[in-house]
């Protein structure tokens, strides 16, 4: 029955995806655009290639330019072979090549550049950006106009903004499963002055309340101290966090406007965290779960399993701990994805890793274009994976029902807290102490 339900859900997703694709093709074609620019990210092939194929089938003169984090010279050669509908691929992290290419195409001129791959010529090298401050403040006017035309709630609109690229932690020694794709293993960040200026401009132009920072990780503590002026904008932010932060950091982030985050806990086993090289421990992760709940910052996080060197004790050690955490944000259980160029990838035999996703519709993909992999599951550990899954499912159910670690009664002159751990305990607060607790 469960398999039939999953199959039905897959069919509905496929149907909806096709309807969305048809609408996108219709809108682009009706715009009578001469050039389509597309930012290709990892795992984005299926939708992008089908979009390009359909657009070219109804307008063979449409020029398609692709750029983005997927576009290295090596991968660009593979991509344009798999999808000949693409005319140009930019292997350039800066905007200069793109601007010159578009201007020349609009004037029907040819343009030769060592950072551009076409069907006739491969890019010779990658142009890596050296700093971010020269990048213009992003223009969302067409998006905002569309929101207004559709009469959607503008006050709920979320706009992305980039403060940094790369991972400062990974620049030193990355997590075991993350290679950040080899050539991009560097960290760049905009100056505090640039960030504050851009955010003020976005706030003034679009009256936005929500920003999603696209950074892989929040900046270091010293940087956050220099952008405290963000607080004055009164906006709400999403930011990805590392787990090696303290209460002072959490308080500062909340004051700045952080209301929602994905945080890289990954596990509640100190041994597993050491293997991953997360720079944290199980007790620190639990402490941060408490802090983030206390400061009313909503979080998502993944509990990872399925490493090639998995140990049974990594998972068994946390099974008895989880019932004490039902009042805190639960994780999603995920089989780990291994990035190309990561420590695990480089230390694994080719037959030990399976590519993720890319070959669902495109069997022609070679290993050179694969980015994400999974290790083969150890059959001897399936029972402990199942136990962990059941525990996390119970955690989610308890949390969604408002599970409380303690019961609070405020129907007398103060607050009475009854807590049940290994024993039953009672706490009484009156006056100012009660008001502080209930704040």
Residue spans for each PLM region:
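Glycine- and acidic
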Residues: 33-41, 179-185, 207-214, 269-275, ...
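Radical SAM [4Fe-4S] cluster-binding motif and immediate context
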Residues: 130-295, 308
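Proline-centered flexible-loop/turn and helix-kink motifs
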Residues: 60, 76, 84, 207, ...
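Short alpha-helical segments that sit at the start of domains
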Residues: 403-435
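Glycine-rich beta-alpha loop elements in corrinoid/cobalamin-binding modules
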Residues: 13-126
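A structural motif corresponding to the C-terminal lobe/cap of the Radical SAM core domain
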Residues: 189, 222, 233-236, 240-405
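Long, charge-rich, low-complexity alpha-helical segments
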Residues: 19-20, 24, 428-439
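Acidic/glycine-enriched edge-of-secondary-structure segments
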Residues: 1-18, 39, 179-188
């Amino acid at each position: 029955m469960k398999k039939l339900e999953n199959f039905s859900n897959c069919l509905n997703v496929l149907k909806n995806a096709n309807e969305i694709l048809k609408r996108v093709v219709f809108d682009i074609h009706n715009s009578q655009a001469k050039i389509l620019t597309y930012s290709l990210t990892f795992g984005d092939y299926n939708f992008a290639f089908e979009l390009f194929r359909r657009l070219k089938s109804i307008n063979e003169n449409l020029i398609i330019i692709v750029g983005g984090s997927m576009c290295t010279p090596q991968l660009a050669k593979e991509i344009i072979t798999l999808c000949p509908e693409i005319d140009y691929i930019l292997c350039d992290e800066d905007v200069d090549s793109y601007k010159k290419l578009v201007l020349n195409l609009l004037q029907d001129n040819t343009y030769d550049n060592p950072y551009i791959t076409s069907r006739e010529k491969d890019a010779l090298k990658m142009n890596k950006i050296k700093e971010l401050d020269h990048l213009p403040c992003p223009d969302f006017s067409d998006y905002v106009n569309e929101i207004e035309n559709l009469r959607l709630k503008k006050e709920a609109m979320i706009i992305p903004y980039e403060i940094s690229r790369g991972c400062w932690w990974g620049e030193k020694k990355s997590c075991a499963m993350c290679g950040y794709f080899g050539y991009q293993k560097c960290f760049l960040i905009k100056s505090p002055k640039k960030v504050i200026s851009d955010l003020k401009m976005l706030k003034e132009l679009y009256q936005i309340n929500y920003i999603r920072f696209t950074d892989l990780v929040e900046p270091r503590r010293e940087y956050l101290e220099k952008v405290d002026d963000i607080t004055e904008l009164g906006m709400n932010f999403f930011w990805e966090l590392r787990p090696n932060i303290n209460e002072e950091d959490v308080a500062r982030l909340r004051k700045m406007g952080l209301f929602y985050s994905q945080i890289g806990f990954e596990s509640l086993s100190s041994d597993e965290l050491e293997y991953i090289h997360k720079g944290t421990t199980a007790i620190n992760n639990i402490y941060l779960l408490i802090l983030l709940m206390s400061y009313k910052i909503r979080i998502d996080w993944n509990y990872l399993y399925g490493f090639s060197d998995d140990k049974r004790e990594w998972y068994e050690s946390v099974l008895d701990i989880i019932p004490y955490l039902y009042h805190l944000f639960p994780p999603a259980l995920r089989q780990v994805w291994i990035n190309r160029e990561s420590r695990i990838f480089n230390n694994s035999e080719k037959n030990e890793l399976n590519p993720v996703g890319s070959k669902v519709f495109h069997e022609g993909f070679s290993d050179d274009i694969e980015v994400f992999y999974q290790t083969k599951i150890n059959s001897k550990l399936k029972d402990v994976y199942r136990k962990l899954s059941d525990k996390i499912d119970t955690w989610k159910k308890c949390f969604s029902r408002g599970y409380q670690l303690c019961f609070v009664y405020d129907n007398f002159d103060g607050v009475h807290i009854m807590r049940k751990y290994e024993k039953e305990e009672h706490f009484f607060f009156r006056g100012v102490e009660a008001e502080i607790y209930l704040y």
